[in-house]
Amino acid sequence: MSDLLRNITPRQRVGRMGEDAVAMRYAEMGFAVVARNLHVSRNEIDLILQNETHLVFVEVKTRHTAPHTPFRFGRPAAAIDKDKRARMRKAAEDYLREHPTSLQPRIDVAEVYVNRLPDGTENVAEIKLFPAAYAGR
């Protein structure tokens, strides 16, 4: 295990697993990663990706799940309240002020569901993408 991975909490490890899976899913759709875990105006943007037409700011929410088990705390995206949406929008606006672009900006949300297997390992069970999740809100 690399020194970088040795010093993170289990929660951070699962979060990173989710972000990696989402970055790969977007790559399959023709997007390239511009930045990861970027701090802008005291807010963090999980992923910034781009293709020929869009610059996408992605908030990734990762949760453990078991098949056919309801979530104790609701769906992962439900953790993004009004204040979090405002911080995401401000971070995206501040990024665009510092990095002007002709690409169309968009804020997406990704839910990642991770299974904990009997042998103690974990794998990504499902990814749900919500493009333009907060357009006009």
Each language-model region and where it sits:
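Catalytic cores of nucleic-acid endonucleases
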Residues: 2, 62-115
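Acidic-basic catalytic patches of nuclease active cores, encompassing PD-(D/E)XK
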Residues: 1-38
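Residues at secondary-structure transition points
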Residues: 9, 13, 17, 42, ...
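Active-site metal-binding core of divalent-cation-utilizing nuclease and nuclease-like domains
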Residues: 28-57, 137
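Short, low-complexity, polybasic intrinsically disordered segments
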Residues: 113-137
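Conserved catalytic cores of phosphodiester-cleaving nucleases, focusing on short active-site segments
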Residues: 26, 47-69, 88
